[in-house]
């Protein structure tokens, strides 16, 4: 990727939404609910505190995260639809080991 976010901004690749309902009905693209989870692609260096010291971010590239429904700004970078948001808009990090245990 040729994009580096500034300050406490984070670049997110939104997770793919469900294409079928639980009852087996195929959901068209314009009726799909946008997923509120995604993967962190890139992070900025961090924000500055009152003293001017750099405060690093809690998330890192590769983290699976949960964010608010209206969080972030949709952008297209290198032909890919991504989100850019501040770290404060991220609600939490999803533990991949727990997800893997559920799938097994």
Curated annotation (Swiss-Prot):
Keywords: Chaperone, Cytoplasm. It is found in: Cytoplasm. GO terms for molecular function: ATP binding; metal ion binding; protein folding chaperone; protein-folding chaperone binding; unfolded protein binding. Signal peptide: none annotated. CDD domains: cpn10. SUPFAM superfamilies: GroES-like. One of its GO terms (biological process) is chaperone cofactor-dependent protein refolding. InterPro entries: Chaperonin_GroES, Chaperonin_GroES_sf, Chaprnonin_Cpn10_CS, GroES-like_sf. One of its GO terms (cellular component) is cytoplasm. Heptamer of 7 subunits arranged in a ring. Interacts with the chaperonin GroEL. Together with the chaperonin GroEL, plays an essential role in assisting protein folding. The GroEL-GroES system forms a nano-cage that allows encapsulation of the non-native substrate proteins and provides a physical environment optimized to promote and accelerate protein folding. GroES binds to the apical surface of the GroEL ring, thereby capping the opening of the GroEL channel. HAMAP family: CH10 (MF_00580). PANTHER family: 10 KDA HEAT SHOCK PROTEIN, CO-CHAPERONIN GROES. Belongs to the GroES chaperonin family. This is Co-chaperonin GroES 1. It comes from Mesorhizobium japonicum (strain LMG 29417 / CECT 9101 / MAFF 303099). The gene is groES1.
């Amino acid at each position: 990727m040729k994009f580096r976010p500034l300050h406490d901004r984070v670049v997110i690749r939104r997770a793919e939404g469900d294409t079928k309902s639980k009852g087996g009905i195929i959901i068209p693209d314009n009726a799909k609910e946008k997923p509120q989870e995604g993967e962190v692609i890139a992070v900025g260096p961090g924000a500055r505190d009152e003293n001017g010291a750099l405060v690093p971010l809690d998330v890192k590239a590769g983290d699976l995260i949960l964010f608010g429904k209206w969080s972030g700004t949709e952008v297209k970078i290198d032909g890919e639809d991504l989100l850019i948001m501040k770290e404060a808009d991220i609600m939490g990090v999803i533990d991949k080991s727990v997800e893997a245990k559920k799938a097994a």
